């Protein structure tokens, strides 16, 4: 569907199907925002964080998450006055209506989505809300759920491409191929649906994470910088000091990353950033975002 074009004419929409009112700016979106900006692509973000009208699946009692919250007399995070004052206000518009408008107005060539188990259904639900006439884009799913449940994810009609594992190098390669009209079905890390077939490629070795750009969170709302912690609200930014983990906690995906990378690349996934790089990153983030934590 893609004809050769200039980078600025390639339009990427990043969909962030975040847990409701969990103010957090992920490393992945910040890194890709920096990569896409450096490459000259046109990009935008749809952040689900501040919407109130999520459509939760019913639990065994037949209650939605919001109904359960009322039943248990617990208070949602957006009732924190201090957070509201600092810009973390919930949106009163419809999440589906706003997403459809974003797609119709921005007209993306590619929609990029990172999902875990708890955000997969929201992402698919939003894509399903887009009228057929406006679905002139391809979708690319990544993240933990897409990596470990790729056979399930790729069968969904709203999914065209899956990036397993680390995404920076493979996704940039895929974008370059889409722009140039090149062959994409042999791109490492990718599971791709096309011509009635599914093409599954092996992982490539992990990159030197000291070369990853410093995250760019400019597309996020100012309130996303603030997080409640121990009864107070702080201006914060996240920092990636290492990627993966050498330990084998059973509740975490990191041991699995080491296993699949060892099997497919003969190297483990875990890597650390250098002290020099970390100092550069700290200095930049402190100057730009002035975090308290």
Where in the sequence are the language-model features?
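N-terminal [4Fe-4S]-dependent radical SAM core
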Residues: 2-8, 12, 187, 193-241
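Nucleotide-activated donor-dependent transferases that construct or modify glycoconjugates
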Residues: 10-21
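Glycine- and acidic-residue-enriched helix-capping/strand-helix junction motifs
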Residues: 20-29
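Glycine-rich beta-alpha loop elements in corrinoid/cobalamin-binding modules
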Residues: 28, 32-35, 42-54, 85-205
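Conserved C-terminal portion of the radical SAM core fold
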Residues: 38, 52, 110, 140, ...
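Glycine-rich, highly charged phosphate/nucleotide-binding loops
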Residues: 57-103
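Short glycine/proline-rich turn/loop motifs
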Residues: 78-81, 105-107, 257-266
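Radical SAM [4Fe-4S] cluster-binding motif and immediate context
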Residues: 210-293
């Amino acid at each position: 569907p893609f004809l050769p074009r200039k980078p600025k004419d390639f339009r990427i929409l990043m969909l962030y199907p975040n847990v409701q009112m969990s103010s957090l700016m992920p490393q992945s979106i910040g890194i890709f925002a920096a990569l896409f900006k450096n490459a000259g692509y046109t990009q935008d973000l749809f952040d689900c964080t501040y919407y109130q009208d999520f459509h939760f699946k019913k639990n065994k009692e037949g209650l939605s998450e919001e109904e359960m919250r009322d039943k248990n007399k617990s208070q949602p995070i957006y009732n924190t006055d201090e957070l509201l004052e600092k810009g973390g206000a919930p949106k009163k518009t419809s999440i589906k209506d706003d997403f459809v408008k974003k797609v119709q107005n921005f007209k993306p060539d590619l929609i990029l989505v990172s999902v875990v188990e708890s955000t997969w259904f929201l992402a698919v639900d939003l894509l399903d809300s887009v009228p057929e006439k406006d679905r002139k884009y391809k979708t690319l799913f990544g993240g933990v759920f897409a990596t470990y449940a790729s056979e399930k994810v790729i069968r969904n009609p709203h999914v065209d491409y899956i990036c397993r594992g680390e995404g920076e190098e493979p996704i940039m390669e895929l974008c370059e191929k889409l722009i140039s009209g090149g062959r994409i079905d042999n791109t490492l890390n990718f599971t791709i649906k096309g011509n009635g077939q599914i093409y599954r490629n092996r992982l490539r070795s992990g990159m030197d994470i000291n070369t990853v750009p410093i995250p760019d969170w400019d597309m996020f709302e100012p309130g996303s910088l603030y997080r409640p912690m121990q009864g107070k609200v702080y201006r914060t930014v996240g920092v990636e000091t290492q990627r993966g983990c050498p330990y084998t906690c059973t509740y975490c995906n990191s041991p699995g990353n080491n296993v699949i990378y060892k099997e497919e690349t003969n190297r483990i996934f875990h890597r650390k950033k250098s002290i020099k790089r970390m100092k550069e990153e700290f200095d930049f983030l402190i100057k730009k975002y002035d975090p308290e934590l």
